[in-house]
């Protein structure tokens, strides 16, 4: 089994390193199962060191000149050759536990796609209330935050990707 992690990134030099480190550490959950993982950063016409930082962290870098997140995700997915895609925003830090949950969902054989709720690093009363409301609605409606989505590659390609 091969997992392709796609990170759309526009001027993310300040946050991308932590994201890549988190993904590399969390990916051990896949390695424990004998699965492989590739990391693809889709540089979305950045003017900073985003692409160079990604390359230095051993990520494959592809480019999407039109600055739009759906296009960046689709370009990254087109370059992927994994059985499953995981889309992670460049300011997110998914951990090993989340990757282990994804692996369990994949292994169940009952899943084509899934995602995660949101937790913010910095909290405030208003911010916590907004995040809590979003997570509640997400669970009720079976929505996923765009910051972490996974799906079977064949299903993603069949529906034509993001729009």
Model-flagged regions — what are they?
Residues 64-80:
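Glycine-rich, basic loop-to-helix element that forms the pyrophosphate-binding segment
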Residues 22, 43-51, 92:
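A conserved acidic beta->alpha catalytic loop
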Residues 2-4, 38:
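Cell-envelope/extracellular polymer assembly enzymes that use nucleotide-activated donors
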Residues 21, 31-45, 62:
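Short beta-strand/loop segment that forms part of the nucleotide-sugar
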Residues 97-126:
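Conserved donor NDP-sugar-binding/catalytic core segment of glycosyltransferases
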Residues 12-29:
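Short, well-formed alpha-helical segments that are part of the catalytic scaffolds
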Residues 85:
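Short aromatic/hydrophobic "clamp" motif used to bind/position activated sugar donors
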Residues 49, 88-104:
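Acidic donor-binding/catalytic loop of UDP-sugar-dependent glycosyltransferases
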